[in-house]
Curated annotation (Swiss-Prot):
Keyword Transmembrane helix: yes
Gene name linked to the record: HRH1
Localisation per UniProt entry: Cell membrane
Compositionally biased residues, Basic and acidic residues: 259-274
Protein family according to the UniProt entry: Belongs to the G-protein coupled receptor 1 family.
Name used for this protein in its record: Histamine H1 receptor
Length: 488
């Protein structure tokens, strides 16, 4: 056996041992990488699906006019945050996991951390402001409709994103404000405050625990309000005829232009004139007055007792409705004290029923309706003017109440969608923030695989959100089918 010049058997054996050690060291680093390949493939698929689904949501909102609503602006904000998580945060996290070390340098590390914290926080805040919007829409439907504009919603969304971007300050400039408590660990991508307990606890409370508790409180109130409204409607539907039945009775009724032996206490101004003695004289007209039960009111007193009171109505030729005069006279004959006793303000909540549906009456509505009741009856042309004003106010009131009812139906479906979004949000993020608090107080309790699992469980929320929209929203479902060319 020959040797190379200058190479002794001892030195050759030492070289072979060193080469063997180097190969074994290489195998020790590549073997875990190969074992992680199936996991890397799965996580890469999750990232691609997250990007595709959130792009689909954004395109659906942009292309479908039915989705151009104020409420969907919050969905767009949530989808943008989830898109950043899927397109930027997930791929860099997969590379970090695959190599078991950060190899992209400190600048890209800070960029990745910034995008991770900002997008995740923006996603949480988007769910929070969406919850507030649903809460106000259900609790204050008429009042909030005037306030609920795209401009105000956009300003709220902008504020949520600006608050989320505040994370950039401690991530990039912690060492400028606070003295570092420890040296950065080699081949690790982590913030300068990773071992600062008080800061981590404070941010966890502000970013997750406080918004989550508020969202749960809001959603409980939403659930109770929707449930109460549904119970009111069931009560009304079981006790009152529908508007179509009333209309059928009206068409079959025999209408006389003059009451049999009675003079109508409230004449149509076009059918009345006033003579010198101040007596109303009927005038010929093609319009007729008939008694018609047009609506009923469901009231709830302070003790929680629910009762109904019928509201007799008058239908006037072209279909306008107003309260019958006998009801008006009973109100006008009340003294000042009894009027105060029976005023609308004494009832905490009232619901009016049209076509079998119950709608809340707001203070503005009731004050408008009660206006003509508070004064004394007038005669002649003044009573005709009062009649026109009262009819117009009743029409406006019923229009607002009907709009409120339609809005309430939409908000009931939106509350269901919000419930699914909140459930996915809490289930995905609470393990991470619980473990986040544990390692903040017990640094020896840190477990890298568990920590990585909780992080990716939070990322998975960005994948689930766009799946929830079509499941809980018919317009999203139809739009998705149209875009993907799926037959209905």
């Amino acid at each position: 056996m020959s040797f190379l010049p200058g190479m002794t058997p001892v030195t050759l054996s030492n070289f072979s041992w060193a080469l063997e050690d180097r190969m074994l060291e290489g195998n020790s680093t590549t073997t875990p990488t190969r074992q992680l390949m199936p996991l890397v493939v799965v996580l890469s698929s999750v990232s691609l699906v997250t990007v595709a689904l959130n792009l689909l949501v954004l395109y659906a909102v942009r292309s479908e006019r039915k989705l151009h609503t104020v409420g969907n602006l919050y969905i767009v904000s949530l989808s943008v945050a989830d898109l950043i998580v899927g397109a930027v945060v997930m791929p860099m996290s997969i590379l970090y996991l695959h190599r078991s070390a950060w190899i992209l340098g400190r600048p890209l590390c800070l960029f990745w951390l910034s995008m991770d914290y900002v997008a995740s926080t923006a996603s949480i805040f988007s769910v929070f402001i969406l919850c507030i919007d649903r809460y106000r829409s259900v609790q204050q439907p008429l009042r909030y409709l005037r306030y609920r504009t795209k401009t105000r919603a956009s300003a709220t969304i902008l504020g949520a994103w600006l608050l989320s971007f505040l994370w950039v300050i401690p991530i990039l400039g912690w060492h400028h404000f606070m003295a570092p408590t420890s040296e950065p660990r080699e081949k690790k991508c982590e913030t300068d405050f990773y071992d600062v307990t008080w800061f981590k606890v404070m941010t966890a409370i502000i970013n997750f625990y406080l918004p989550t508790l508020l969202m749960l409180w809001f959603y409980i109130r939403i659930y109770k309000a929707v449930r109460r409204h549904c119970q009111h409607r069931q009560l009304i539907n079981s006790s009152l005829p529908s508007f179509s039945e009333m209309k059928l009775k009206l068409e079959n009724a025999k209408v006389d232009t003059r009451r049999m032996g009675k003079e109508s206490p409230w004449e149509d101004p076009k059918r009345c004139s006033k003579d010198a003695s101040g007596v109303h004289t009927p005038m010929p007209s093609s319009q007729h007055l008939v008694d018609m039960p047009c609506a009923a009111v469901l009231s709830e007193d302070e003790g929680g007792e629910v009762g109904t009171r019928q509201m007799p109505m008058l239908a006037v030729g072209d279909g306008r409705c107003c309260e019958a005069l006998n009801h008006m006279h009973s109100q006008l004959e009340l003294s000042g004290q009894s009027r105060a006793t029976h005023s609308i303000s004494a009832r905490p909540e009232e619901w009016t029923v049209v076509d079998g549906q119950s709608f809340p009456i707001t203070d503005s509505d009731t004050s408008t309706e009660a206006a003509p009741m508070g004064g004394q009856p007038r005669s002649g042309s003044n009573s005709g003017l009062d009649y026109i004003k009262f009819t117009w106010r009743r029409l406006r009131s019923h229009s607002r109440q009907y709009t409120s009812g339609l809005h309430l139906n939409r908000e009931r479906k939106a509350a269901k969608q919000l419930g699914c979004i909140m459930a996915a949000f809490i289930l995905c993020w609470i393990p991470y923030f619980v473990f986040f608090m544990v390692i903040a107080f017990c640094k020896s309790c840190s477990n890298e695989p568990v920590h990585m699992f909780t992080i990716w469980l939070g990322y998975l929320n960005s994948t689930l959100n766009p799946l929830i929209y079509p499941l809980c929203n018919e317009n999203f479902r139809k739009t998705f089918k149209r875009i993907l060319r799926i037959p209905p």
